[in-house]
Amino acid sequence: MKDFFLFLGKFFKHGTAIASLAPSSPWLSRTTVRNIPWENARVVVELGAGTGPITKVIADRVHPDCRVIVLERDPDFARLLRERFANRANFDVVEGDVRDLTQILQQRGIEQADFVVSGLPVPSFPKELQRDLFRVVKQVLAPSGTFNQITEMPWVYQRFYRRFFDEVTFVFEPRNLPPAGAYFCRGVKESF
């Protein structure tokens, strides 16, 4: 319940900079990472982790040799995530901006990520920030990698993500309140 009130307070203070009124449910969190073959994943990046419900699912499933980079801009959320996942040697919680992701990974000796999991409210971003985000994703995502994006607006943004990716699928999760889902996007387009 503490996470809910922290999240709600951030939402009212920062509006659409916070993706939701509340943290993702366990069902939505599992749906968002359901396509990841955990035994083969080498690098997973999570953007906008908030209080960490998706991060927890990643922690429960990832093997110890897989590097997990969690990027969170909000200092309170980043501090909370560092505390929650301090015992995970393969986890690195970074307080920072998504536009700096390439440098953040390079500083850690990482060239590419197998999966980028996003809890960011991307469609609410200004157009230039959207383009910046997907330029960075194009730089860091392995050619066979997937960009996983959670949404509380089921199916509404299919066309939006198709502007940036060759292949976009959507999985609905009705048990989340409000009903939500995840987009699974592959093949970042050359230009957008």
UniProtKB/Swiss-Prot annotation:
The family database entries (CDD domains) matched by this protein are listed as: AdoMet_MTases
Top-level lineage group: Bacteria
EC numbers listed for it are 2.1.1.344
SMART domains assigned: rADc
UniProt entry tagged with the keyword Transferase: yes
Query: Which key words tag this protein in UniProt?
Result: Methyltransferase, S-adenosyl-L-methionine, Transferase
**Keyword Methyltransferase on this protein?**
yes
Quickly give the catalysed reaction.
Answer: an N(2)-[(3R)-3-(2-saturated-acyloxy)acyl]-L-ornithine lipid + 3 S-adenosyl-L-methionine = an N,N,N-trimethylornithine lipid + 3 S-adenosyl-L-homocysteine + 3 H(+)
A GO molecular function for this record? Answer: rRNA (adenine-N6,N6-)-dimethyltransferase activity
State the coiled-coil residue ranges.
none
Please describe the relationship between pH and activity: Optimum pH is 8.
Which top EC class is named for this enzyme in its record?
transferase
**A Pfam match:** Methyltransf_25
As for what it does, the entry says:
Catalyzes the 3-fold methylation of ornithine lipids. Forms ornithine lipids that are mono-, di-, and trimethylated on the delta-nitrogen of the ornithine head group.
For this chain, the family text in UniProt reads:
Belongs to the methyltransferase superfamily.
Q: Which NCBIfam families match?
A: ornithlipidmtase_OlsG
Name used for this protein in its record: Ornithine lipid N-methyltransferase
